[in-house]
């Protein structure tokens, strides 16, 4: 498939979905997806919550370790708060706000053995951390990306809060890059739930890309250019985008930088990112000549048997 702008790809996705399954109410599905996040909230809930059968829960998370970890989102039907995928969810929600503004903690083993209401939980609220000795660049990098993206989303509405998010995003990126290491080698229990199959290089590139989006600081663009080959940014041609593999997302974001600004000093490297972004978009649009993403008869992109909905939910944002 020839050169394809991101805006054209977006139009094609809308057209393809509309012609494939016009009977489905996508507006209702979108509203339900946001309601799901509201139902998954941990901590003190506001009085105007729409999920009225949910109440306050886990109000002392982190206190045993001397930190305040109250709040956030539960992972699934259990009550674990996995920072790695939770940060990715925040990044993607923030990206959605940016692009469509006008339209729009626990022990895994013990927790999975007991399924109950969060308000009634009695299982351990063990907290695990990363630091300079117990490294976890994936978690720190993804959280940096989440805060940078959220900073960008909040900037038009709350400049003070946006600046605070950006400050911590920069700090976390520096930490992730300085003390490099895989989080699932430090926190070995995490391998059973959220193993890092792609390592931490994609998270470092992803975080730097979002920091460039939030700041326009050329040093971050220099980072993704200098590390493009070594970190796989211009080497990985992927057909999936999810909490563990950020290559497609960062490739699309950097293509946007190229198309909108040119970025002359780095244009040759950005064009390599663009080529990989086009591979991903074309695979989703069934235009990749034998290297397409599978699709169900109803028009749903199908990546994997296990928890497949996580993939098509995020693909429309970079696409």
Q: Which stretches of residues belong to each language-model region?
A:
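Bacterial N-terminal signal peptides that target proteins for export
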Residues: 1-8
